[in-house]
Amino acid sequence: DESRPDFRVMDAATRSMAARLTPGTLVSYETTLPVGTTRGRYKPLIEEVSGLVEGRDFDVVFSPERVLTGRVFADLARYPKLVGGLSESGEARGVRFYEAVLAFDQRDDLPRPNGVWPMGGAEAAEMAKLAETTYRDVNIGLANQFARYADAVGIDVARVIEACNSQPYSHIHRPGIAVGGHCIPVYPRLYLA
């Protein structure tokens, strides 16, 4: 069923990691998951395989990757690192970890300082990743529909989009072949999982 995520690889990696887990470990998932998966799927799996208890023996956080291939290090410095824990203490530990290993660009355009942003729970961090990628998916699809319409009525869509994006409430992407890639078309379906 293409509407459901295939967790087999993540499950196998989690089992392998959990079999070797030692007390005091911080586990961080850096991927894209349906909301609730870190807590509802991976916490119980880690506990079952390791025999340890999350929040007491180890901590789990979800911290989505927000980088593009070919510009990973630049993106790590450019964008806030989102961290959501399964417990307050685990989230604080995850924040301290990422603050210790990442450096961030100065950005005056953000609502708060660039750096590690605690999300108040793994579910909020999972949803943030889905929301930003779904926004991109919808925006690309919308731009493509504008282009189709403009072509049908003889209007230069590039000029229209440039005009729309001249004010701060519009962020229309450029139209292209379609919404593509290995991730963006798939992520909106994770709301249904």
Where are these regions (language model features)?
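Structural/interface elements that position substrates and couple domains in central-metabolism enzymes
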Residues: 1-193
